[in-house]
Regions:
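Short, well-ordered alpha-helical segments
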Residues: 2-37
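A cross-kingdom feature marking charged/low-complexity
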Residues: 39, 44-67
């Protein structure tokens, strides 16, 4: 039997939503093995300063739990 776990990660990027989503997955890969899928749940822009907006994504990441 295979068991999966889901975590929700929020990441930001000054470049794009795509970069933010990839960053969320890459950072999760550094501490979690067997990632199976990722789904972008939400996107927004953080407007701390007009010159440097931050693209923010909320990503649900699923991975297989080892037995």
């Amino acid at each position: 039997m295979t068991v999966h776990k889901e975590v929700t990660i929020t990441a930001t990027s000054p470049e794009s939503w795509e970069e933010a989503a990839l960053s969320a997955v890459e950072r999760t890969e550094s501490s979690v093995e067997h990632i199976q899928w990722a789904v972008v749940q939400d996107q927004s822009i953080q407007l701390g300063s007009p010159e440097e907006p931050q693209f923010r994504t909320k990503v649900k990441i699923g991975f297989e739990v080892e037995e």
